[in-house]
Every structure is written in C-alpha cells, then in structure tokens.
Amino acid sequence: MAKDYPRSRRIAEQLRRELAEVIRDDVDDPRVGSVTISEVQVSRDLAHATVYVTVLGAEAAEAQAGIDILNKAHGFLRSQVARRIRAKRTPSLRFLHDTAFDRGARLSALIDEVAPPPADDEPSKE
C-alpha cells in the first residue's frame, strides 16, 4: 500500500474544492448533470490526480457520458484549477465514476428485502 503524505492530502483536498467550483460555475454542458466530487487521489509526485465523481439522479449510461465529457475537458479544467491554486505544477486529471454510493444503495435494498421495516399500524407492546 502506498504511503499517504500530508502534502498530497492537502493538494487533493484543495483540488476537490476547486474542481467542484469550476465544474459548477464554468462547465455549461447539460450532459454533465449534477456532479459531486467524492474523492481526489493524488500521486506521490503530484503529477497525476484521479478524481472520483458521482452523477446524481442519472442512469449508468448517462453518468458515464457525463464522466466522458469531464475527461475530454480535462485540459480546460486543469488550466482553470491551476489559476486558482498555488502550486508549482497542477496534476493531470482523470475522472472515474465512484461506485461506492451505488453499492451502498444496492446493499440497503438487499437488507430491506431480507428484513423489511416494521409497519406503522402494528400495535405497540406496552
């Protein structure tokens, strides 16, 4: 497992904040949809950043289309972020779909199937 360095954590958090603002304010493509950046992982040499995103309220194909658009716009996004952060170098960006939310929703649905929540109209035990 790779070591986690405080500088790379700081840069990752700063990238996450700035990318969220840039995508919200400067990306006008409606195919991107409502994007949430859940995590940014930066390489030790700070040359590459993997950005995990979720597209809210979108089917898998629509979400992937939005992520593909972000990957095509990575140069624009990188230049906009470079203007906002103080770093010698801005990492190259790669956007990936974060499946953690989808897995959590699927597990929650499976749990509800096995043990459905109690009905409200059952008499309480007193």
UniProtKB/Swiss-Prot annotation:
Domain of life: Bacteria
Bridged cysteine pairs (disulfide): none
Xref: NCBIfam families: rbfA
Key words of the record: Cytoplasm, Ribosome biogenesis
Species of origin: Halorhodospira halophila (strain DSM 244 / SL1) (Ectothiorhodospira halophila (strain DSM 244 / SL1))
Compartments in which it is found: Cytoplasm
Record note on quaternary structure: Monomer. Binds 30S ribosomal subunits, but not 50S ribosomal subunits or 70S ribosomes.
Gene3D superfamilies: 3.30.300.20
UniProt family annotation: Belongs to the RbfA family.
Protein name according to UniProt: Ribosome-binding factor A
Taxonomic lineage of the native organism: Bacteria, Pseudomonadati, Pseudomonadota, Gammaproteobacteria, Chromatiales
Function, as annotated: One of several proteins that assist in the late maturation steps of the functional core of the 30S ribosomal subunit. Associates with free 30S ribosomal subunits (but not with 30S subunits that are part of 70S ribosomes or polysomes). Required for efficient processing of 16S rRNA. May interact with the 5'-terminal helix region of 16S rRNA.
One Pfam family from the record: RBFA
GO cellular component terms, semicolon-separated: cytosol
InterPro entries to which the protein is assigned, alphabetical: KH_dom-like_a/b, RbfA, RbfA_dom_sf
Gene Ontology BP annotations: maturation of SSU-rRNA
GO terms of molecular function: ribosomal small subunit binding
